[in-house]
Amino acid sequence: MRFLKFFMVLAALLAPALPAAAQSRMKAEEVVVAFAAEPRTLLPVTIVDWTTNNMVEHMYDRLVDRDPKTYKPIPMLATSWKVVDNTTWEFSLRSGVKFHNGEPFDAQSVKATMDYIKDPANKTHYASRWSLVKEVQIVDPYTVRFITEKPWPGLIDRISLSDMMMMPPKALRAEGPQGLLAKPVGTGPFKFGQWVRDEKLVVVRNDDYWKGKPELKTVTFRFIPEFSARLAALLAGEIDIMKDVPPHAVDLVDKSGKATVRATVSSRINYLALVTLRPGPMQDIRVRQAIAHAINVDELIQQVLRGRASKMCGPLSPINVDFSPKVQCLKHDVKQAQALLKSANIDPGRLVLTLDTPSGRYPLDKDISQAIAAQLGRIGITVNVVVNEWGTHLDKIKNRTTGDMFFLGWGPALDAQNTIEQLFQGSMTYSSYGGNKPLDDKIATAITIVDPKKRLEAWADIQQMVASEAPWVFLWQQHDLYGVANWIDWQPRADEKVWMYEAKIAKR
C-alpha cells in the first residue's frame, strides 16, 4: 500500500503543471473541494457536524455572520440587533431577500426555523442548544424578538454559528423536511445542483444573491476519506482545495508547481475523551489522571504532527474569548501515572482499553490514536484502537457505544458556552463526561451572567474545575493546512469555514 501511495503521488508530480481537467474547470469557473466525508444531511439545523454544515452553509444563510478576520458578529440576514431587556433580543431583518424558490425571507422565516428546531418531533441536535429560547415573536414583517427563559448574553454568539440557518416556511409546510432534504432551498450564494451519494455534492451560483453573485459558477464537493488519496488528487489536478495536508507532505505540495499549502491556526481543539458516562475504569479520577500523565503530548506534536499544533492545558484554546491562562498543564510523568494506578488498585498489565478514532477527519487522527496506544503501552496498558468511518464515529459517540476513550475535535466555538456546556454535561450529544452537579450549576450560572468581567471570572473558575477532573487528555489547538491550486485566490479562516463565496480565479 505504501508503494502504491508513493507512485500515486509521483505520477501526480510528473503530470503537466496545469492538467487539462483543471484548465477546463478554470474556464468554466468551477472549483472542486475535497472533504474527508460527505454531509450527513442536507437539511439544516439538524446535525451538529462541521463537515456537513460547511457544505450546507453554501445554500443557507444565518441571521448573523462573523467577520473573517476579527470573528466578531456582523450582519447577514439581520441588519442590526439590540438588547431590549435582560431576556429580550430584537433583530431587524434584511428586506428584499428571496429563497431559491422565490419565497420571500421575512419574520415568518425566522419564527418557522426556530419552531422547527424546538419541536421535539423533529429530533434535531440543536434543540438543546436553543433551550434558553422561550419563543420568537414577530413584531412586524421585518422585525423579530427572541424571548429567553433567563438572561443569555451569549445568544449573539450562538446565532452566528450554524445553529440557525434560515428555512423557507411555506416550502417547509408544503414539502416537509424530506422535501428540503431532497432539494435544499435556502437564501445562500449557491443553489443545490446534485448530490451523488458517496461521491460528490454540486452547488451552482445564485445569480440573485442579495450580497452580490459569487465569482464561481459551480462548486463541487468531493468526498475522499484518505489523506493520501486527497493529496494525490490535488497534485494530479483532479481537485483544487483539500483540507488537512499531512505535515510531512507540506514541502511536496509547495514544490509541486501546481499548488501551495496555506496555513492558519484554527479555533478547533483536538482531545482524547475519557468516557465516564457508563461503568468502567474511567469513572475513577485516578485512572483518568494516570492516563493523562502517561501520554506525552509534546512528543505527539513533534513526532506525529511535526510541530503543527499548539499544546493545550484545559478545555479552551487561547483564541476563545473566555480562555483562562491560569489553567496549568498536567505534566507528562510516568512514575506519577504508575502511582495513581496503584492507588486505584489497578494493575496496568491487566488493564485493556478501547480507543475509537476516525480516519482522515482530523490531521493524522488515526496515526495519533495509534501513537497514544503505544505511549500507554509503555506503562503496560493494552489499548485496542478501533478505526471508524466518520459518520459511524459520530453515531457511536451520540449513542454512547464507543470504547473507553475516543479521539475528537471540537470547533469552531469561540466562546466558552459553546464548548463547555456541550461537552461536559452528560445530557449533551457529544459529551463523554457528566453527572457533576456542582459543575453543572456553575455552568448554568455562568451562561446567564450579564456583566462581562464577572462572566469571564466565572468561566475561568469553571475551566480550572474541568481541568482538575481530567475528563479528557487535553491535546492541542489544531493548525489547519490547506492545499490550494495556484490558480485559485482563497485564504483559509481560523473558524474553518471553507467559504467558496470568497474564492476567486487568480489567473486566467
Language model regions located:
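Aromatic- and charge-enriched surface segment that lines or borders ligand/interaction sites
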Residues: 79-123, 139, 145, 230-233, ...
